[in-house]
Amino acid sequence: CVCPYIDGKWDEVLELARSADLETIVSNTTEAGIAYTQGDSQFDQVPPNSFPAKLTRVLFERYKAFNGAADKGLAILSCELIDNNGKELQKCCNNYAKDWNLEPAFIDWMNNANTFCSTLVDRIVPGRIRDPKELAAMEEANGYHDAALDVGEVFGVWVIEGPAELEDKLPFKKAGVNVMVVPDVTPYKKRKV
């Protein structure tokens, strides 16, 4: 997990982009975070304003570090609550690449070596427990006080739209977690709503 605002160390984020071990980026910026506004971020800004601009900068750093090697592309899992979140993120990144006049070979690498995955998360978490009696009973059962005690439904699924080989890269199946890699999230979205 990387937060570029801890001590303002954007250079450390860019250093991670150059890591041969990096394979996956997961974003969860809220639906407002997947947005493009022309001129809001500059290539050399530290850091760029929007998440898509930051991601474009990270991808460009990686492209340069590995001389555009196709096998150094990343799986980018967008978890924002918007339709086609991966595709929307990719559109934003393309807009920034064009705004910044980045080389066509980079844009080609960004779109073909990287996989922008749309995802669907389905699990209801209603919020903090406010009933003092229920809270006390749960804390007694747990054996400790938890200031942020919450509950969630037992059912949960994360559906990732991507190539089948992504399932082998991600450790979810081995861990027994209900995560599926599918060619299209649409049927799962329809089932959810």
Task: Identify the function of each model-found stretch.
Residues 1-193:
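Substrate/ligand-engaging "lid" and interaction regions
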